[in-house]
Amino acid sequence: MGSRYIAVAALAAGTTLSAFSAQAAGDLNLICSADVVICEQMKGDFEKAHSDIKVNMVRLSSGETYAKIRAEARNPKTDIWWAGTGDPHLQAASENLTLEYKSPMLDQLQDWAKKQAESSGYKTVGVYAGALGWGYNTEIFKTKGFKEPKCWADLLDPAFKGEIQIANPNSSGTAYTALASLVQIMGEDQAYDYLKKLNANISQYTKSGSAPVKAAARGETAIGIVFMHDAVAQTAEGFPVKSVAPCEGTGYEIGSMSIVKGAKNLDNAKTWYDWALKPDVQSRMKDAKSFQLPSNKTAEIPKEAPRFEDIKLIDYDFKTYGDPAKRKELLERWDREISANAN
């Protein structure tokens, strides 16, 4: 059989959903919810390994992807969704938006990755994991005489007014994980009281989860609340960024992967799914400064990756906070009490 060809959508910040939709009859329609650099690397590596499959890919945050897949449920334009926090993947699974698939690679995965699959009825699977924290610009801290924030409580210091960025939890899985983590650490009412106080120090709620620490790296803000591996990536790029795991404890993500129910290129989606769980593929993620913990047991763990054993992790309740009703409840309250009063 000859090779099949489609026009490949440009993967860049300006890539539009309309461009994606217009080319949705191709060999594999993929949404990537990781950083654009690893998205590009994964796309290129897959096409080298499977030269007869051309990938039409768009980069979207996980909250945006969940909303898109939900809106297109009657006429899916996406085949597979790779990466992004696990909560929206679980929400999609619970709404029957994604397809049950038991990969032959399952036995090679870490327990937390397999548990993610089992809890969703095998409608999603863990591909990497990473803990929540923040990164701060050491040069700004030195210049302004700031004290290192070691705990969630420290971020409320009035000295940090206008010096912190975090993403919007409506669009960002990172920020939703932060919201859900604080609710689990403090209790819901106390968490929203905390977020109201923190709001005074927030200069911007970004669309993308990793954007806050990239802004800190560029000197545009002092602190970015992100997954710690995103902060480490900026340090590895040579920026003056130091990573912090909060002293009270923190949540974590299980970055996940799901096949969309009704995928028009199902066989190719399964090919990507199995390929993305291979140890050599996950070991290469560090080449894109992607320093998460890989889900394959034999994949190489990047030396830069923040290790779970060094971090005070909460027993994050993925089932509860991956429920669509709970997500809706938390986000509506965030919109009323936090977003409505944003600076």
For the regions a protein language model found, what residue spans apply to each?
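Early extracytoplasmic/lumenal segment of secretory-pathway proteins
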Residues: 25-91
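A ligand-binding cleft/hinge motif common to bilobed small-molecule-binding domains
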Residues: 87-91, 217, 222-240
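Conserved C-terminal helix/tail region of periplasmic/extracytoplasmic solute-binding proteins
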Residues: 316-343
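Extracytoplasmic ligand-binding site segments that recognize negatively charged/polar headgroups
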Residues: 33-40, 77-220
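Periplasmic-binding protein-like
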Residues: 111, 130, 194-199, 205-206, ...
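Sec/Tat signal peptide C-region and signal peptidase I cleavage site
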Residues: 18-24
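Bacterial N-terminal signal peptides
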Residues: 7-18
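Mature extracytoplasmic/periplasmic domains
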Residues: 255-318
